[in-house]
Regions:
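Short glycine/serine/threonine-rich phosphate/pyrophosphate-binding segments
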Residues: 35-46, 125-133, 157
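Phosphate-binding loop/pocket of nucleotide- and phosphate-handling active sites
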Residues: 131-174
Length: 174
């Protein structure tokens, strides 16, 4: 019932949004990039950022194959936790200034890169957020400060495509 419960975005208005604003008080922030599943983070944190820092561009990101906010039809995708086959009632469509889509492969590759290069063990939706943030960075003015959320751990994905073809160290033969 998170999709319909006004407490969902309210929680992010009271916690995530103020935490971001506090962390960036007196500091530059140009973009906030967030995927959407239940709509809580994008709506709640996004509303607070827009209210307090109207110069910050809010960017929604969604699967390229299920880009409902972009007007596309839903198609199954592999970014678990993102974009059900409907737009949640609590999602405020007026929050994002723009929408960036990412593919399943981009999301998985970004998640794997975060693990191998940065030691951040995150899930596919976090990879999607990071992949979208990289797309924003490609077009943003030099020196822009871009914030995204890495909201899930890769432990939830051990039996999914995220780890497909990755052998355990103990499985490798000499």
């Amino acid at each position: 019932r998170q999709f319909e419960n006004p407490a969902n975005p309210a929680y992010h208005r009271q916690t995530t949004g103020p935490e971001i604003l506090g962390d960036f008080a007196g500091r530059r922030l140009d973009f906030f990039v967030s995927g959407w599943g239940t709509g809580g983070t994008l709506t709640g944190a996004g509303e607070m950022i827009r209210l307090a820092r109207p110069e910050v561009r809010i960017v929604a990101t969604e699967p390229a194959g299920a880009a409902l906010l972009s007007g596309a039809e839903f198609k199954p995708h592999k970014i678990q936790g993102w974009t059900p086959d409907f737009v949640p009632r609590v999602l405020n469509r007026s929050v994002p200034h723009e929408i960036v889509t990412v593919t399943d492969d981009e999301s998985i590759a970004a998640s794997r890169a975060l693990a191998s290069k940065e030691g951040i063990f995150c899930g596919i939706s976090s990879g999607g957020n990071f992949a979208a943030a990289l797309k924003v960075a490609e077009k943003a003015p030099e020196g822009s400060v871009i914030l995204t959320v890495l909201a899930d751990t890769a432990e939830r994905y051990l039996s999914t495509v995220l780890f497909e073809g990755i052998a355990e160290g103990s499985d490798q033969e000499p």
